[in-house]
Each structure stands twice: as C-alpha cells, then as structure tokens.
C-alpha cells in the first residue's frame, strides 16, 4: 500500500487554524472511506510540552499510549476516529535529543553531525514511521513560514516530497487574506509574499487555504492562483464560522477532497458527512441552556482547558442544551469567598499543579457538596474534593496533599513512588526527581463499583481512561474517609489505586483521577460529561420551582 502525504504549513501570521483545517480535511477524507492520520511537528526545543506553562502553550493532550503532546492532537481525535499516539507529535527538542544520543553512542562513525543531513533525516524517518499503514497522512508544521526554528522541518518535507515522489505528496499552505474596511476589499499581497517565502525554501504549494473573516471572492481567488502558480480550483476560501464543526462541509463544498483524491489517484466514494450535519443541527437547535462554573488557575488562557471546554459542549449536544462556561479563578474564591459561585447550575474543577489557588478549589468543592450543586472533579479536582471531605466530614483537621504540605498530619493524597515509563520499565521517583516524563500517563483500566452512579453512566463494569498525574489517594487513610460516607466508585485494574469517588445522598457529585475530556468527541460525547450536563439541567429546573 502506498501512503500519500499532505504537508500543511502556515504563513503571514500564527493562529490561522492549521490544526482545525487539517483535522477538517482529514474528517472529509475519512468519510470517503480512507484510512487517515495526522501528525504535528513542533519547532520548539522542549522535548515535549509536558513541563511547559499552560498559560504559554495551552493544554497538554495525553494520548492512549501516554505521550504528552500538543493540544492540536485533541482536535485531530475529535474530528477523526483514528487514535493518536506518540508517533503523531514530535518536537525539535526530541529530534536533537535523539540525534545527540546517537552521536554519543558513535552511531555516526565519526562523521560531523549537521542539520543537513542528520537532523533532516531524523525528521523524515519519524514522519515515515508515523505514516505507516495509512492511505493519507496530513503533516502539520508548527509555527509560521519564515520562522528560523521551522527551517529544518521545511527542508525535511521538501526532501521527503522528492524521496516519495511528487505524485504522493501535496503541499497545502494556509495564509491570511485580510479585509481592509477603508478599501472595501480583501488584500492578496500578504498571501503572495508568504508563497514567495515558501518558494525561496524550495516548496511550491499545491493548495492554498485562504483564511479570512468573510468568503474570498472568486476574482480574488483567481488573482491569487495567477500570482502564486496554483490552479484556481486549488485556491480555497475558509471564512470564519460560528462552529468549527461546519468547516468539513465548507471545504467539501469547494471540492477540496475531490481535488486531492484526483491528485493522488485515489478511487473512493463521495464523502458522507451526515454525522457532522447532525452535530451542526444539534448545536444550532438547543432546547435550553445551562451555566457551568469552571474553577481553575490558568483561566487567562482558555486553551489551557481546551479539551474540557470542548467536552462540556459535547455534553450539551447530547442533552440538547447550550453550555455557557463561566471561567473562575480559584484565587478569587480565596479572596472574595464562595459568593462568586452563586447562580451556577453546576461546578467543575479541572486538573492542575501547584499550591496556588488550591484552597479556593477546596472551598469550591465544599460549596458544591453542601449546597447540592452538581460537581465534577477531574484529576486535582478529585484530590481537592477528597481533601475537603476528609477535613469537614471525616474529622481529619488540616488534611492535605503532600504536594502542598509535605509534613501534614493527614496526607490523604500522596506521591506515586513507582510508575512505568514509555518502554514498560518500572521507575522509582521521589520529590527531587525530574518533572518531565515522570507521571502516571496514558490509558489505564478502571473497575467500577456495581452500586455507583458512574456504573450507570458508563453502562459497563470496566472502563479505560487516560491519566496524567503524580499524586494519588493515600490508601492508608482511606478507610476513615469511607467510614464517614465517601464512596469509592472506581479503582485501578489491580484495585490498588482510587480512580473515582462519589458523595452519596447528593444529586450528582463525581470526581475522577483520570481525564475523561481526552476521549470526548462531538459525535459520541462522553458518559461523564453527558451525565454532568444533564444533572446541571435538572438542578436548574429544581431551582426554578
């Protein structure tokens, strides 16, 4: 089987939406029966985004096999059925780390190690490895054409197109076509200059995706085609839309998938986008709305919680309600009190690290428990719920996590001292160990209690969810907390670790150690988020009586 590659680049400015465009195109090709995957190549020198600030980089998306990756991989999984893995995302730092390790071992037999060919060859090898077994692979190059750090990746894909043959390689370039109100027209010159920059590197784009706040007129697309040496039918207008799930239909309506299939000589049926049409219909025709408060510490950048926000929206689709998300800084809860949590239909505390704002999260969990407000805690959101219950119900004054107070009297949450690395080897860590790559990561099995709410929601006794954490419930103190009324609703496959807790005699109080947001999709939703949004809707109705 021959694998075909579409290399996706961006020009003029960043944040044009390369990831959404690539994912949308992949969704159309998948709907034509093709086996599709997507890769993201990031030009920063960090080995992975695992230790990067969420406020700078956005969320870290965790794959089934435990890779800490760029948030664009979350978009990919929400748009196509193919599961991402560590092969789908790598960085400059990872490439240099691999090459330097080989150099130290003597693998290069004394050769002078250079960007070309050693770095570019390493990039090409990873791209080819990631594409094995697929009909079409979309490869998104992070950053903007012209950035110095992107040059090795651009050179690598230029070479790769020659290596595999131009009949199996396409270059798709996203570019900004701004509208100038003073002139009353869109301007194509930035696109021309962006393509000129690509040509100077040796890459002639085959497809141009024109990003604008409005549809780019046919005469302007013809002008772009003429000056950029691209067929008119390969100049695609991608205007702003009110829902990203409309983009597959927008691209298909302009024949982008037909053009690609003809270029690759792929004989496949027309794309059936009925599932996406259903998503768009549900999104546009809600029967009501709810307001859910999300209390976190990185709220100045909503992308830090991208998958959670999307999963809440998916939960809304499954309940035919619009979910309005109110982002609340947990430090504001500390300084202004729980009064700012009033008038919410439900409360969610997502994952996070560090002590800043944690007491505000603990106060939030108490407010939700005592006032019968639906609560969903994720990762740290479960740990603060446990701490709150231990302090205020189980009589364990000043209970805490050793992450925040190492010598506390009741360490109800403690460090995981053993975990398996990406090769399956058991590693031992302590508080002084490196932060990068030293967490419980990836898909883990969980056994659900028969009498639990989550057992009803999932409709199964065993589930698999993705993890990203260093701290866990301390089993040594668990019996006292359970005796006070807390229910352990889910345990790890070996029954050693607490994965889910519930508060009985509460309308809906569920907290999990894993990250359910990573497996939620617009077409299928997720049982926890669907149940949570339903509980929010029911709470709203109770309050209205």
Swiss-Prot record:
CTP binds at residues 14, 147-149, 187-192, 223. UTP binds at residues 14, 187-192, 223. The active site is at residues 379, 515, 517. Gene3D superfamilies: 3.40.50.880, P-loop containing nucleotide triphosphate hydrolases (3.40.50.300). Residues 1-266 are annotated as: Amidoligase domain. Allosterically activated by GTP, when glutamine is the substrate; GTP has no effect on the reaction when ammonia is the substrate. The allosteric effector GTP functions by stabilizing the protein conformation that binds the tetrahedral intermediate(s) formed during glutamine hydrolysis. Inhibited by the product CTP, via allosteric rather than competitive inhibition. One of its GO terms (molecular function) is ATP binding. Residues 291-542 form the Glutamine amidotransferase type-1 domain. It is an enzyme of class 6 (ligase). The keyword ATP-binding applies. Pathway: Pyrimidine metabolism; CTP biosynthesis via de novo pathway; CTP from UDP: step 2/2. CTPSs have evolved a hybrid strategy for distinguishing between UTP and CTP. The overlapping regions of the product feedback inhibitory and substrate sites recognize a common feature in both compounds, the triphosphate moiety. To differentiate isosteric substrate and product pyrimidine rings, an additional pocket far from the expected kinase/ligase catalytic site, specifically recognizes the cytosine and ribose portions of the product inhibitor. Catalyzes the ATP-dependent amination of UTP to CTP with either L-glutamine or ammonia as the source of nitrogen. Regulates intracellular CTP levels through interactions with the four ribonucleotide triphosphates. PANTHER family: CTP SYNTHASE, CTP SYNTHASE-RELATED. This is CTP synthase. It comes from Salmonella newport (strain SL254). The lineage of its organism: Bacteria, Pseudomonadati, Pseudomonadota, Gammaproteobacteria, Enterobacterales.
């Amino acid at each position: 089987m021959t694998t075909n590659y579409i290399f996706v680049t961006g020009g003029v400015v960043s944040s044009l939406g390369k990831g959404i465009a690539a994912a949308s195109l992949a969704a159309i090709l998948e709907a034509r029966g093709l086996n599709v995957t997507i890769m993201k190549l990031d030009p920063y020198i960090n080995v992975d985004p695992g230790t990067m600030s969420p406020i700078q980089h956005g969320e870290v998306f965790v794959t089934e096999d435990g890779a800490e990756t760029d948030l664009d991989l979350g978009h990919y999984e929400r748009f196509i059925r193919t599961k991402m893995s560590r092969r789908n995302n790598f960085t400059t730092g990872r490439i240099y780390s691999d090459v330097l390790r080989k150099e130290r071992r003597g693998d290069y037999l004394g050769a002078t190690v250079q960007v070309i060919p050693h770095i570019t060859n390493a990039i090409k090898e990873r791209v080819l490895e990631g594409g094995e077994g697929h009909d079409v692979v979309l490869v998104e190059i992070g950053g903007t054409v012209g950035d110095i750090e992107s040059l090795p990746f651009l050179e690598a894909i230029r070479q790769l197109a020659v290596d595999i043959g131009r009949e199996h390689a396409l270059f798709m370039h996203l570019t900004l076509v701004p509208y100038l109100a003073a002139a009353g027209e869109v301007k194509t010159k930035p696109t021309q200059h962006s393509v000129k920059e690509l040509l100077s590197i040796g890459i002639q784009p085959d497809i141009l995706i024109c990003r604008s706040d409005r549809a780019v007129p046919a005469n302007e697309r013809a002008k772009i085609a003429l000056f950029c040496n691209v067929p008119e039918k390969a100049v695609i207008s991608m205007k702003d839309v009110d829902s990203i799930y409309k983009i597959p239909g927008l691209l298909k309506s302009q024949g982008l998938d037909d053009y690609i299939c003809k270029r690759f000589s792929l004989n496949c049926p027309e794309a059936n986008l009925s599932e996406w049409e259903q998503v768009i219909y549900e999104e546009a025709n809600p029967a009501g709305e709810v307001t859910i408060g999300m209390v976190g510490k990185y709220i100045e950048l909503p992308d830090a919680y991208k998958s959670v926000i999307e999963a809440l929206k998916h939960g809304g689709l499954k309940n035919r309600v619009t979910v309005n998300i109110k982002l609340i800084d947990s430090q504001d809860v500390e300084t202004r009190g729980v009064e700012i949590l009033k008038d919410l239909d439900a409360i969610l505390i997502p994952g996070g690290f560090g002590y800043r704002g944690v007491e505000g999260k603990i106060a939030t969990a108490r407010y939700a428990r005592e006032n019968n407000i639906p609560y969903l805690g994720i990762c740290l959101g479960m740990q603060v719920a446990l701490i709150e219950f231990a302090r205020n119900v189980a009589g364990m004054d000043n209970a805490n996590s050793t992450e925040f107070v190492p010598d506390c009297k009741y360490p109800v949450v403690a460090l995981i001292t053993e975990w398996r690395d990406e090769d399956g080897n058991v590693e031992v860590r302590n508080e002084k160990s490196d932060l990068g790559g030293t967490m419980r990561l990836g898909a883990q099995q969980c056994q659900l209690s028969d009498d639990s709410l989550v057992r009803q929601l999932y409709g199964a006794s065993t589930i698999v969810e993705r993890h990203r954490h260093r701290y866990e419930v301390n089993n040594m103190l668990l019996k006292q907390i359970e005796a006070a009324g807390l229910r352990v609703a889910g345990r790890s496959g070996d029954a050693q670790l607490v994965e889910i807790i519930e508060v009985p005699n509460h309308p809906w109080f569920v907290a999990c150690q894993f990250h359910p947001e990573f497996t939620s999709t617009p077409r299928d939703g997720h049982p926890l988020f669907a149940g949570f949004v339903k509980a929010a809707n029911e709470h709203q109705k109770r309050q209205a009586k």
